[in-house]
Design a protein with these regions (language model features):
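Structural preference for long, well-ordered alpha-helical segments in enzyme cores
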Residues: 16-19, 51, 67, 71-72, ...
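Conserved long alpha-helical elements within nucleotide-processing catalytic cores of c-di-GMP signaling
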Residues: 69-70, 79, 156, 160, ...
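Helical mechanochemical/support elements of P-loop NTPase systems and associated helical scaffolds
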Residues: 12, 16, 64, 121, ...
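Hydrophobic (often cysteine-bearing) scaffold residues that line and stabilize catalytic clefts
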Residues: 16, 78-82, 210
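Active-site core of bacterial EAL-family cyclic-dinucleotide phosphodiesterase domains
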Residues: 2-71, 109, 171, 251, ...
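Catalytic core of bacterial c-di-GMP phosphodiesterases, primarily the EAL and HD-GYP domains
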Residues: 3, 9, 38-50, 56, ...
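EAL-family c-di-GMP phosphodiesterase catalytic domain
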Residues: 8, 56-59, 111-116, 138-152, ...
Length: 272
């Protein structure tokens, strides 16, 4: 029974890998947008969104990133997918702008290997922004923390080039992977996204000691000129405590799940 399940898993993964190029051509990859809300004012305010890839497969149906991203990390297709996601996000932003929306910044995830790779992702990114006439301040690049194979000094050098080109940079899922606070301090990033795992253990009746690490991480980020986004927030008491700690933005199911483009657009204001 176990062997049958394992064999089926391997077969499915191989099919997904083999179907990648065809899926690109058939527009099977779509973006969902999870809002980021600022919590410093009297009322939560939409400040941006993270573009999250989904695969609508004719054979397997709706596939979340956990089903295919690890496969593409192995076979090199992730670098191609990164480019595709950026293009989809810019195309959607152009549609919103043309329709009269006050578009908010959209962040896209970029693998570390793409940042330092020889495929010149920076030139590609600038070309796509120019093609769709997207102001560079409407795209933020989120650097995934989960790849330890990239030399940190090399990564920092390339990130400085991206930043000098005008891109806003965020460290995604901070605390889930290989970055240290020391490395964070030396990276030219504008935003720190605190991983969901920090907040999973929070309880309404917990002591301040149980959350003091987050308090001081937010302060450290602010002291070095960065903004902070808390990810995976689902409860009101979490929002209240993060507001008390001066966190800038919240991303999570408390405010909204990831939304199709049409639903997300309804949360943006139209230009007068």
């Amino acid at each position: 029974f176990f062997d049958d399940n394992l064999a089926e898993k391997i077969r499915t993964e191989k099919l997904l890998e083999n179907n990648f190029q065809q899926a690109l051509e058939n527009n099977e990859f779509v973006l969902y947008y999870q809002p980021k809300y600022g919590i410093k004012g009297a009322e939560p305010e939409l400040h941006g969104a993270e573009a999250l890839i989904r695969w609508i497969s004719p054979e397997y149906g709706f596939l979340s990133p956990g089903r295919f991203i690890p496969l593409f990390e192995r076979d090199g297709n992730l670098e191609i997918l990164d480019r595709h996601v950026l293009k989809l996000a810019c195309r959607q932003l152009r549609q919103w702008l043309d329709a009269g929306y006050k578009a908010v910044p959209i962040s896209v995830n970029i693998s570390r290997r793409n940042i330092v790779g020889g495929n010149n992702f920076l030139a590609y990114a600038l070309d796509v922004l120019a093609e769709y006439q997207i102001p560079i301040n409407l795209i933020q690049l989120e650097i995934l923390e989960t790849d330890a194979s990239v030399d940190s000094k090399l990564l920092i050098r390339f990130l400085q080039i991206f930043k000098s080109s005008g891109f806003s940079l965020a460290m995604d899922d901070f605390g889930s992977g290989y970055s240290s606070l020391g490395m964070f301090n030396s990276m030219p990033i504008d935003c720190l996204k605190l991983d969901k795992s920090f907040f999973d253990s929070w309880q309404p009746d917990m002591s301040e000691r149980d959350s003091c690490l987050i308090k001081y991480m937010i302060k450290a980020a602010h002291d070095t000129g960065r903004t902070v986004v808390a990810e995976g927030i689902e409860e009101k008491f979490q929002v209240d405590l993060l507001r008390q700690y001066d966190c800038d933005m919240i991303q999570g199911y408390y405010f909204s799940k990831p939304l199709p483009a049409e639903e997300f657009a309804s949360k943006m204001h139209k230009r007068v």
